[in-house]
């Protein structure tokens, strides 16, 4: 049993190393570099007479990539720099700083799929495994996005497979 685990670990590290050679090492974006647009949303309209204060941002990033392990980590990466405050890491139920994001250690060990057009990322933590979180997270993101970018302008909606 221990030999199997050891061989799995060796294989995993080998695959991660190969992908790091292809895609490069990921670093943390410093605050001095701006690689994206930030759209501030103060409120959303619920109907003609009602507004709800939200005070959130929608981030627009050109030519970036998204990596997720579908549970704890979502990394938004541009030019091999992970973007803090947009990327997400929740480890054992606790939100952590960007320095804990998995891609900084293991890279992005998946084949990159390219999409021509606008992609709205709807991935986040438990939404892949929990129907309530899926609806709660997705609907909120769609409503926020609609305030700045009409959903008909989105070519792809990136959600978890499950």
Where would I find each of the regions flagged by the language model?
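Catalytic donor nucleotide-activated moiety binding site of glycosyltransferases and closely related
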Residues: 158-162
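Phosphate-centric recognition/catalysis
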Residues: 2-140, 146, 150-156
């Amino acid at each position: 049993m221990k030999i199997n685990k050891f061989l799995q670990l060796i294989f995993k590290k080998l695959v991660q190393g190969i992908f790091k050679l292809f895609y490069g090492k990921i670093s943390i974006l410093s605050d001095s570099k701006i690689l994206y647009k930030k759209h501030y949303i103060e409120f959303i309209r619920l109907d003609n007479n009602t507004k709800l204060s939200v005070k959130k941002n929608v981030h627009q990033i050109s030519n970036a990539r998204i990596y997720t392990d579908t549970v704890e980590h979502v990394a938004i990466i541009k030019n091999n720099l992970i973007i803090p405050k947009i990327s997400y890491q929740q480890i054992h139920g606790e939100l952590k700083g960007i320095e804990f994001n998995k891609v900084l250690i293991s890279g992005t060990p998946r084949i990159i799929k390219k999409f021509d057009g606008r992609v709205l990322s709807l991935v986040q933590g438990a939404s892949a495994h929990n129907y309530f979180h899926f609806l709660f997270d997705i609907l909120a993101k769609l409503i926020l996005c609609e305030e700045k970018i009409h959903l008909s302008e989105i070519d792809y909606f990136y959600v978890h497979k499950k």
